[in-house]
Amino acid sequence: MQSKEDFIEMRVPASAEYVSLIRLTLSGVFSRAGATYDDIEDAKIAVSEAVTNAVKHAYKENNNVGIINIYFEILEDKIKIVISDKGDSFDYETTKSKIGPYDKDENIDFLREGGLGLFLIESLMDEVTVYKEPGVTISMTKYIKKEQVRNNGERVEIS
């Protein structure tokens, strides 16, 4: 059996107004690949966090709006998403060390600011790799479970 592979590329201005367009595209890509509703929602949150981080941090020192590149690679059993910018970089390991673990009994008013987006991305995606310089590139992979609907309307996952 021949393996199926598709590749989709987007370039958008690093502006918050484009986050919804990226989420909509992601929904279409994941739906077309047969992903479950839960996998689609998890990926939308993770990608929104990564794009929002790029919008807020990558080009803050530059008065011009930069560009964010988004790539979707659809494989037989997974979807790889790569989000990159050419803006300011950050030290991923240092930022990661300052987040979590969060205690379920911890008062939300006292949670540390920053880094929560990275925590969400790593929690919701199956594989996450961050490359820096030039800019920041976040590569995320979601292994997809297929979903079917039975005659009675019940959704079931298939392998």
UniProtKB/Swiss-Prot annotation:
Keywords linked to the UniProt accession: ATP-binding, Kinase, Nucleotide-binding, Serine/threonine-protein kinase, Transferase
Catalytic activity, as annotated: L-seryl-[protein] + ATP = O-phospho-L-seryl-[protein] + ADP + H(+); L-threonyl-[protein] + ATP = O-phospho-L-threonyl-[protein] + ADP + H(+)
Gene3D superfamilies (alphabetical): Histidine kinase-like ATPase, C-terminal domain (3.30.565.10)
Protein family (similarity comment): Belongs to the anti-sigma-factor family.
HAMAP family: Anti_sigma_B
A Pfam family that the UniProt record links to this protein: HATPase_c_2
Entry protein name: Serine-protein kinase RsbW
GO MF annotation list: ATP binding; protein serine kinase activity; protein serine/threonine kinase activity; sigma factor antagonist activity
CDD domains: HATPase_RsbW-like (cd16936)
The species this protein was found in: Staphylococcus aureus
Regions that span the bilayer: none
InterPro entries: Anti-sigma-factor_SerPK, HATPase_C_sf, RsbW
Entry's EC annotation: 2.7.11.1
Function (record text): Negative regulator of sigma-B activity. Phosphorylates and inactivates its specific antagonist protein, RsbV. Upon phosphorylation of RsbV, RsbW is released and binds to sigma-B, thereby blocking its ability to form an RNA polymerase holoenzyme (E-sigma-B).
EC class (word): transferase
